[in-house]
Amino acid sequence: TDTGLYGDGEAAIAYGVGSTAAYGMIQDLAKLIIGMNPLDTEVIWEKLYKSTFWAQNGGPIVFAGISALDIALWDIKGKYFNVPVYQLLGGKMRDKLRCYASQLQFGWGERKTPAYQIEDYVANAKKAVSEGYDAIKIDFFTFDPKGYRYSSEETTRVLDPYHVHVVIDRLAAVREAVGPDVDIIMENHSYIDAQVAVQLGEQAKKYNILFFEEPTTPNPKMNKFVCDKLNIPIAQGERIYSRWGYAPYFEDGSIQLIQPDIGNCGGLTEAKKICDLAHIYDVGVQAHVCASPL
């Protein structure tokens, strides 16, 4: 700002493809708000949404750009009033947050060993639990037993018994290793399609998974199809943007846990509104993040 205050923000497009586009979007959007009062976060958010053309019904790049600027503006606001941002949002609900050890298929600890064989999954799970984690998240269908990544052709068709057993045997072994008191989140990264999600979900039920994350492409109708077939909580949100993107999932009851990423759903301004909507529909919230410590 012209008074010397500055804010930090971040676009959550650090993985996958698109970081260069997000950087360019931030630059373009920033030009629109030069000269505005940084404390007017609602006014600025609406300007970014309405005056850019592409934000309405927009996707990850435009909302990542909005998010980065919005987070920075809230940082400025907190510094200006000399209070934590959570105070400006209405106050904190708790002093501690439960955390889970995530993406154990890539390994865990200082010397990460990707999981190919069943014993690799078990070893990584045990490492995390030994550090005090009482919840772990694993994508059991990333690597085949030889260490190769599964192709989309292999994961988006009705699975033969062999591939079902590969996934479920890994899950079963991890459940046996960590016991009944550690929650297991079954991650999928939307690699599988709806039919495969139902196949795997039916088999996964007996292992009492906490939730089934991104079981298929983020699409309300496909999510509803999976949800109706399974009695397992479904989680989505890493790739859903703005309250307009979330509304269909709330309205049809196809999601039980949302995972909005503050760095790409529209920033703190929009994330608060998304979470308020979730509260109306008794949908749980677990903020997603896969970015820097910021």
Can you say where each PLM-predicted feature lies in the sequence?
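Glycine-rich beta-alpha junction loops
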Residues: 13, 142, 290-294
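Shared catalytic-loop signature of beta/alpha-barrel
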Residues: 24-27, 202-211, 217-294
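Metal- or metallocofactor-binding catalytic centers and their adjacent structured scaffolds
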Residues: 2-80
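Metal-dependent enolase-superfamily TIM-barrel catalytic cores that perform enediolate-based chemistry
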Residues: 96, 101-220, 224-225
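N-terminal amphipathic alpha-helix/helix-capping segment at the start of soluble metabolic enzymes
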Residues: 79, 83-97
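Conserved, mostly hydrophobic/aromatic
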Residues: 4, 29, 69, 82, ...
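Ligand-binding pocket scaffold of soluble enzyme catalytic domains
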Residues: 8, 40, 80, 98, ...
